[in-house]
Amino acid sequence: IPGIWENGTPYCHGGTFKVVADCLLGRGDKAYETITKILPDADSNPSDESGCEPYVVTNMYFGPDNPRKGETLFAWVTGTAGWMFRAITQYMLGFHPSYNSFTVNPCVPSDWKEVTMTRVFRGDTYKVTVKNESGAQSGVKKLTVDGNAVDGNEVEIFDDGKTHEIIVEM
């Protein structure tokens, strides 16, 4: 059927995988462009056409070749929201957890000069600030944790229940 599923549908769930791939390749501008197309109530998917609440990350919406163009299906039965959260926090903002540590490796649009995120992880609170005066899309020039320089981009988990400040310079 034209304009449904993989046959010409804007597939939001798959779009989140593209965001991750773009970030892994250092393409912050492309990653952000995709996010703006699949976010709820985006210009390409206005809620007054989709029949979906304007705050719901949907699985897909019918493409232009389908008689139901713009309508959405499976708004509440999809992993798209979880993958969107993961794509943004772990890959764009670069807070990627592992067992005893996390890496900080942001991939952001070149016109973002600064972005912040607060993340609670294993009982600790991390306030992450990404500074991008150079207009880079990826790469870490300098990383500090609680004012102390860190070699590389891996941070050991504190496990102390406190708040820690991370500053990333791209």
Regions found by a protein language model. Give the residues of each.
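Non-catalytic C-terminal accessory modules of carbohydrate-active enzymes
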Residues: 1-6, 10, 17-170
